[in-house]
């Protein structure tokens, strides 16, 4: 008996796959709903209720009631993405027997039910009332309403504000004429004070004015002044919300029974340096003076004291600083003793590492020497030698199959601004450092040999009060020399006359890049910004015309028979973090970049070109897989040369939620692409055009997992293509409407901060 095997129709196989996907998706959502709906009533005692939700509202429109949420002592159980009560559902899956490992694990991962507590609710009402009174609402009241449904309770706190108290008139009662002059009460700049007529009468404003006066006096020689010497007297008429305020400075007493006197003003008599080590002080006297803001003969200043601490903290030769003041008996003079403890001047480190490049195994080793006090001025010299070796497989037609790289780098950092055209007073106030660096890199590959010589001089400085840091590259010089290229590599990649090979060939020619640049970073926890701009070749172009430099066959000016690059490039990166609660936040991100070659260059150097896709870009695509524009690589393969551009746009919105322990989840939508500024034959659809670029913006969506170890984050992202500009058919262009896991899914792993 023979058995005939029937073929299965293609439409039937596709239908089965579609049904299977829907079954898997349905199973996932059913599991999610099961965890969300898991009953926690077995952990809720009789006559008690689960605190399901807390709401805070005001009886006055425009008042930000949500800002007072920190005063609510009980919060409901956290929810994933502010929607799914998974932590409570996980805890509810556990049994009562805590000796079992599975129950302990479920309870550790989940969250114990929050039971409504009337005692904590009453304390919350009192705290809210005090907070409102401190904000000027002296007659404020708070009531609590509870809504019960089954074993669940919703708590609603309503704020009844009343009329706020406002400052009608401010009078300063200060007898000491010296302090009056310092506070400049009779001058226009006094308007910067926190207490102004018509402003709301708040504890915060009183504290601001107290701190302002205290800072001014501490910076003006009043060494023993503190905030407790400032008292406020407020007076208001009955049934009136206007406050007449008196700011009074109490007199000074040397001790409790001493008579009252004017506050003494102290001056610095002498400044000395000492060291806790037997070897003494390792810094030159000029460096000590340069970093000391405290000067003999000047009034004591808390600002100068802090500046001196900050200056010595920047010196890597110094481990810690301790500054002491000693009063001279029966005088208002101070002796200052600055005690320094030094770091070890020399360090030597050795680091081996293994490498794996696309399956090719290799090894590398680096040796680093650091001197933290080279010229006894806390100059830091860092010298690093590195060697790497890798066995390359899969190359045909080449005599050698090994990759070798050797690198030597030297950096010399000065903890001050090296600028002879600036005054010494300005340099002393500056927190900038200067850095001089040199490096030489040697690469020997089967395809080519490359040598790169680099030199740079730059400034760096910080402004902690503004959460900002800056970098200025006065000169950054790179010389790329190609001593040898194999005939096989030339024949296969460089000899073709197409534009693709023009881009590739440009990166395997001798090249000189001399650039200048400026960059800034800002981050205050809610807003983060990175901006950079650089220009290259302009100075050389000026010399080329004046000194009549030679031109090569392509019409480019050359220096030592090497063409130099000329371009301008700017980048802007901005992130906004919106925090909803301790477990949920929203991150908005945009990244813009534009680079334009001109003058002596028709093409950007390859390392200055933009690419799209990857863990820090549009996460539905792999690195360098997207763009430019609607361009698609040959046969859908990644083209590392052609899939680059002169401008980029990346946008992202990411909702982040804490899961358990150090695990965090994320749901994201990304959008962006890259474009070229010129039309290239080998990059059809890649040029930026104002009337159609928005049609070429790629969109992706997905989920991510974060493992937060405080110092670094492990990121796992699963992205799916939603809109693919490389295709015109509706099925492939709008991939979100016709998802195909094999075609659209991309996995990313990265280490670092999200962005």
Predicted regions span which residues?
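Strand-connecting loop/turn motifs
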Residues: 137, 222, 345, 376-378, ...
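Bacterial Sec-dependent N-terminal signal peptides
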Residues: 1-50, 131, 590, 751-755
């Amino acid at each position: 008996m023979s058995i005939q095997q029937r073929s299965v129709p293609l439409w039937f196989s596709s239908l089965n796959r579609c049904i299977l996907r829907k079954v898997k998706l349905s199973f996932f959502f059913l599991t999610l709903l099961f965890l969300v709906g898991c009953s926690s009533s077995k952990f809720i005692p009789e006559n008690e209720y689960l605190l399901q939700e807390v709401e805070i509202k005001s009886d006055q429109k425009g008042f930000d009631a949500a800002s007072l949420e920190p005063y609510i002592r009980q919060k409901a159980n956290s929810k994933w993405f502010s929607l799914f009560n998974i932590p409570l559902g996980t805890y509810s899956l556990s049994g009562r027997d805590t000796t079992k490992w599975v129950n302990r694990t479920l309870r550790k991962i989940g969250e114990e039910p929050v039971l409504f507590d009337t005692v904590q609710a009453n304390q919350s009402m009192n705290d809210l009332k005090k907070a409102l009174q401190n904000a000027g609402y002296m007659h404020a009241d708070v009531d609590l309403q509870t809504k019960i449904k089954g074993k669940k309770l919703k708590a609603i706190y309503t704020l009844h504000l009343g009329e706020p108290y406002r400052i009608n008139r401010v009078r300063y009662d200060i007898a000491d004429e010296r302090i009056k002059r310092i506070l400049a009460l009779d001058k226009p700049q006094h308007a910067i004070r926190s207490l102004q007529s018509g402003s709301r009468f708040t504890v915060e404003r009183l504290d601001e004015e107290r701190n302002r006066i205290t800072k001014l006096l501490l910076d003006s020689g009043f060494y023993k002044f503190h905030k407790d010497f400032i008292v406020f007297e407020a007076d208001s008429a009955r049934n009136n919300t206007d406050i007449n305020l008196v700011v009074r400075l109490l007199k000074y007493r040397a001790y409790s029974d001493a008579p009252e006197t004017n506050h003494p003003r102290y001056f610095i008599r002498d400044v000395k340096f000492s060291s806790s080590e037997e070897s003494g002080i390792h810094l030159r006297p000029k460096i000590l003076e340069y970093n000391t803001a405290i000067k003999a003969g000047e009034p004591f200043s808390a600002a100068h004291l802090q500046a001196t601490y900050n200056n010595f903290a920047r010196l890597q030769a110094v481990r810690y600083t301790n500054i002491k003041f000693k009063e001279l008996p029966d005088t208002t003079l101070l002796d200052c003793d600055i005690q320094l403890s030094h770091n070890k001047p020399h360090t030597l480190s050795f680091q081996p590492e293994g490498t794996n490049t696309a399956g090719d195994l290799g090894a590398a080793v680096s040796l680093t020497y650091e001197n933290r006090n080279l010229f006894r001025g806390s100059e830091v010299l860092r010298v690093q030698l590195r060697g790497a070796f890798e066995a390359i497989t899969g190359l045909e037609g080449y005599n050698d199959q090994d990759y070798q790289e050797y690198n030597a780098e030297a950096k010399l950092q000065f903890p001050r601004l090296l600028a002879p055209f600036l005054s010494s007073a300005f340099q002393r106030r500056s927190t900038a450092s200067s850095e001089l660096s040199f490096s030489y890199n040697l690469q020997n590959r089967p395809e080519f040999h490359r040598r790169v010589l680099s030199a740079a001089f730059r400034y760096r400085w910080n402004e902690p009060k503004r959460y900002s840091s800056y970098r200025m590259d006065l000169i950054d010089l790179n010389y790329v020399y190609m001593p040898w290229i194999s005939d096989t590599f030339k024949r296969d990649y460089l000899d073709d006359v197409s534009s693709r090979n023009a881009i590739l060939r440009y990166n395997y020619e001798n090249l000189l890049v001399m650039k200048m640049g400026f960059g800034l970073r800002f981050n205050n926890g809610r807003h983060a910004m990175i901006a950079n701009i650089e220009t290259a070749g302009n100075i050389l172009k000026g010399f080329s015309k004046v000194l009549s430099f030679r031109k090569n066959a392509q019409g480019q000016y050359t220096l030592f028979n090497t063409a130099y690059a000329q371009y301008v490039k700017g980048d802007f990166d901005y992130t906004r973090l919106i925090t909803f609660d301790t477990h949920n936040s929203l991150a908005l991100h945009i990244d813009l970049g534009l680079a334009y070659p001109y003058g002596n260059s028709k093409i950007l150097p390859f390392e200055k070109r933009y690419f799209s896709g990857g863990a820090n870009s549009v996460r539905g695509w792999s690195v360098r897989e997207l763009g430019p524009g609607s361009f698609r690589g040959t046969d859908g393969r990644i083209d590392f040369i052609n899939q680059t551009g002169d401008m980029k746009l990346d946008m992202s919105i990411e909702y982040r939620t804490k899961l358990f322990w150090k695990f965090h989840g994320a749901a994201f939508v990304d959008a962006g692409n890259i474009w070229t500024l010129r039309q290239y034959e080998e990059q059809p659809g890649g040029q930026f055009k104002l009337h159609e670029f928005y049609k070429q913006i790629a969109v992706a969506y997905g989920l991510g997992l974060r493992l937060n170890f405080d110092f670094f984050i492990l990121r796992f992202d699963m992205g799916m293509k939603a809109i693919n500009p490389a295709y015109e058919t509706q099925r492939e262009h709008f991939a979100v409407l016709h998802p195909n896991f094999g075609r659209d899914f991309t996995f990313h792993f990265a280490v670092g901060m999200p962005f």
